[in-house]
A protein has these predicted regions:
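DNA-contacting interfaces and partner/effector-binding or oligomerization modules
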Residues: 1-102
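Helix-turn-helix DNA-binding segment
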Residues: 134-171
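Residues within the DNA-recognition helix of helix-turn-helix
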Residues: 122, 174-178
Length: 193
């Protein structure tokens, strides 16, 4: 996690979280310095004097795809008690929409296609506690596609994925093709980015 003071990401009952002077604004995973600086500059300067429950901005970029293929990352971030906002690139939008449909702790998915005014509106609603309607997303992965992606990223062959998912190889090829359409790049390109 990264806030302006480098506070570690801990459980919501931790003294570190309760004493955070930056009103609990965090970025996870905290590997991209520019992403962290941009988020903190935009949020802390605008909302520093307001009590907010806490927000974690998730750097949901393609280079972090391995983090987001099972539910453990959501469990980890939910333990803080913070609201979760996913900031994703175009390739990861379908996966981000899938996770938003799976868990209400994820309050929004922000993509590079949204205008600044729309992004500010989303963040305002979350900070001030307004309830946003949860829309069904057009481009969202399904459970089988996420499971396939998890197995493929772990290095399994299509045949072993077929066995593990208890389905025939033709169905696996259909899932692979569906993923390509929703993500916008091939599986090979996804794994090499």
């Amino acid at each position: 996690m990264a806030c302006g003071y480098g506070c570690p990401l801990t459980d919501k009952d931790s003294d570190i979280i309760k004493r955070c002077p930056l009103q609990k604004v965090a970025v996870w995973p905290s590997r991209n310095r520019f992403f962290i600086k941009g988020i903190l500059a935009a949020i802390t300067s605008r909302y520093e004097n307001i009590f907010i429950r806490g927000i974690i901005f998730v750097d949901f970029s393609i280079k972090h795809v391995r983090y987001f293929l099972n539910y453990s990352w959501i469990t980890y971030l939910k333990s803080t008690g913070f609201n979760i906002i996913i900031v994703c690139d175009a390739y990861m939008e379908a996966l981000a929409n899938y996770w938003m449909e799976q868990d209400s702790a994820i309050k929004a998915v922000i993509t590079n296609r949204k205008k600044i005014k729309e992004i500010k509106g989303i963040i305002n609603r979350i900070i001030y506690g307004a309830v946003s309607p949860r829309k069904i997303r057009l481009y969202s992965l399904n459970h089988d596609e996420v499971r396939f992606l998890e197995l493929a990223v772990s290095g399994k062959s299509l045949l072993s994925i077929s066995t593990e998912m208890n389905t025939n190889i033709k169905c696996i090829y259909n899932i692979k093709q569906s993923l390509r359409k929703k993500i916008g790049i091939s599986l090979n390109e996804l794994l090499t980015k």
